[in-house]
Amino acid sequence: MAEAAAAAAAAAAAGETSASSGSAAERDPDQDRAGRRLRVLSGHLLGRPQEALSTNECKARRAASAATAAPTATPAAPESGIIPKKRQELMKWNGWGYNDSKFFLNKKGQLELTGKRYPLSGVALPTFKDWIQNTFGINLDHKTTSKASLNPSDTPPSIVNEDFLHELKKTNISYSQEADDRVFRAHGHCLHEIFLLREGMFERIPDIVLWPTCHDDVVKIVNLACKYNLCIIPIGGGTSVSYGLMCPADETRTIISLDTSQMNRILWVDENNLTAHVEAGITGQELERQLKESGYCTGHEPDSLEFSTVGGWISTRASGMKKNIYGNIEDLVVHMKVVTPRGVIEKSCQGPRMSTGPDIHHFIMGSEGTLGVITEATIKIRPTPEYQKYGSVAFPNFEQGVACLREIAKQRCAPASIRLMDNQQFQFGHALKPQVSSIFTSFLDGLKKFYITKFKGFDPNQLSVATLLFEGDREKVLQHEKQVYDIAAKFGGLAAGEDNGQRGYLLTYVIAYMRDLGLEYYIIGESFETSAPWDRVVDLCRNVKERIRRECKEKGVQFPPLSTCRVTQTYDAGACIYFYFAFNYRGISDPLAVFEQTEAAAREEILANGGSLSHHHGVGKLRKQWLKESISDVGFGMLKSVKDYVDPTNIFGNRNLL
């Protein structure tokens, strides 16, 4: 009975796919929703129906997506998190995020964010202008120039093996050799990459972009690449900040950009085991949106949630801001399917834990596209929390704030998210405060400032602020909140209000747009991260920030750089630290060289002070010069041996890590 019902559900879901084989604009959203519910139902009844369901839908998708040198695609609707084939119709080709979202200074000199996607969109931020002028010494009348559009004649030509192309056409896997599609997938979002897009061009870009729609498509692509000795560079959301997507300049083989964005479905949800089986190209925001319809979430929320994908999370060992409740990606993944040149890697069962030698999953997690393509994954889900509350705490200084976070970690009572900003980062956040709506609100803000700085004696140039996010059962959240604030009080912390905490988290998804604004005014900057033991956190933060200031001064940067940090994740034995640095490069002949030398010096300082090479950004090509010393010669040799066995002819040749 259950098998028959599940078979009917699977058949209906497959039929829905066939019926919706037209463009995205022709699809009925109610029909799509019904199809997802049928997949959920089939998951309940059979537990693991994905094999038959995936094959049926894969065939339907391939039939609907005939191979073409210039595939057309309808941009995703604003409420959808699906990345379209033609990414440039929805997203910036030479900057961060959506085309309709951009920071600018209006006629009154107030900062605004265009579009309607974010809570800050259309909101006037009146104090930012003074902050950016005072911090960087810039003249707002001096603006840089950049290329307004991509000129195909400026891009390297596409060189594709003709025999491969002939066989590819038989598979009906969609592809493109157009310059804009190839350039869009030739980079991530490191400062160097964006700078090149604005003012130059990459020496090497993919020769062809392929859009598989299911696991079987990926198997065919990898087999063809092995047959013709081609290079594959997988891409998910394209949010890499480690040069992970940059094509090796001396690669002479045809380079395939294998774009997983059309592998974006939840294949089933199992409410008994609280797991969901998903395709690896689904973005974080789309995954959360669909799960929310059924009352669930993963809780995995990296800052790149809008665009990064499940496959990208796994391949870089990602971390989310609410890991204190839900865990990092290594805690969430139950099962995965990976296509390699040697074949498919997949465990035979989905048990919660196994003692079967070294965990095969951990060979894939953090492999950064060097071993194969992650096509599907089973991940843990949780019921959507019933209650969420923000908060903030002001400390007299950064050191006392760190001591408080250490005690919270020791007592294992950290909220879903806790972030501690140093003073400069607090000042930056304060510069992004919206215009007050009334005299009364302004008066209250003045009272709060007076109370903290005059009555309690906090120095405005020393104080540090922690933002908090609690979620779960309402009664437990309120108890948890009291426990955290009681600990904070022992370290001189003062409750600074729910609004300040919420505003801090509202900036999470728009802060990346700020770099594009800076580039317009001769400001280049970047963020980078590390993790360190608790007893090294304060010294590491101080020494790295000072090293950045010293390096910039020695290299001729005329105005002191912005050099700031925050503690953004806490653990029993240490913390993750995020650094931001930026400087005014006007008058410097080679700003990229100065930037890269300063960033490298900061990384050297991190390692010298007991920090890790990376907490969650990964290694890529940007940091691989330090990998061997980080994991030892023997450890490095082990990684290389795995690579040599799984991919002996270097089909996955992005040259990350090794």
From Swiss-Prot:
GO biological process, one term: ether lipid biosynthetic process
Modified residues (Phosphoserine): S65
Alphabetic keyword roster: Acetylation, FAD, Flavoprotein, Lipid biosynthesis, Lipid metabolism, Membrane, Peroxisome, Phosphoprotein, Transferase, Transit peptide
Active site, UniProt feature: Y578
EC main group: transferase
Regulation of protein activity: Inhibited by N-ethylmaleimide, p-bromophenacylbromide, 2,4- dinitrofluorobenzene and divalent cations such as such as Mn(2+), Mg(2+) and Zn(2+). Inhibition by p-bromophenacylbromide is strongly pH dependent and is highest at alkaline conditions.
Name of the protein in its database record: Alkyldihydroxyacetonephosphate synthase, peroxisomal
Species name: Cavia porcellus (Guinea pig)
The organism's taxonomic lineage, starting at the top: Eukaryota, Metazoa, Chordata, Craniata, Vertebrata
Name of the gene this protein is made from: AGPS
